[in-house]
């Protein structure tokens, strides 16, 4: 089969980067991560990120661990709500639903139109799965989710809210809590210090006032946003959902523990009343 050529600098290349991290993690640490969709996609495309060394190793571990964390939360929610909606906010080419699908849940994948176009091309829609092209800040997407409170709903976002301003996130989260009672939201976040380094590296044209972008220093501030939040908890991104693998090595595991302890790498879980 002829492989699809992925052009440098394209939307496809950007969306494939997180999958590359998971692919490399599976190759370096067999048995620790499992993403068959990721492997299949990379067998069908021709692309070379040319990333080697310690930074590739760190990026691969972090990308795969983040998916593991978010999948763990979704899987736990589905135990009590097997017919739940599973909503992927800013989905890109994320394949988490295939890791947690119980045969009853319904998936909704949300992203900008260009990202959804790539997703439709490389992944398509499967049974009980709907791809929705939208702007997350335009809350009209709420009405496209076939939500039934008795069935439940769980939202997850992987590497998404770093690029949102705090007021945008507050508006979105509070509206979600009102519209989807009994639901749950899980996402990754960092402190203001970590966000400053991240945005200066990734967003050359970001707002000069980096402080307006979303980060989580004090969990109490996030809790105060809405009386419709029943709980807000924070766990370590790298250590919160399972122990570190000894194969990562002493030095990297020490670094990972520090990142979690200092709250530079966080997973936030919000439960709606």
PLM region descriptions:
Residues 154, 176-192:
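Conserved beta-strand signature within the Rossmann-like core of class I S-adenosyl-L-methionine
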Residues 210-236:
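Short alpha-helix
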Residues 245-273:
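Core SAM-dependent methyltransferase catalytic element
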Residues 1-87, 91-134:
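Rossmann-like AdoMet
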Residues 163-176:
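A short, conserved alpha-helix within the catalytic core of class I
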Residues 192-210:
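Short, glycine-/aromatic-enriched active-site segment of Class I SAM-dependent methyltransferases
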Residues 229-254:
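Conserved catalytic loop of SAM-dependent methyltransferase domains
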Residues 140-150:
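Short amphipathic alpha-helix with an adjacent loop that forms part of the alpha/beta core around
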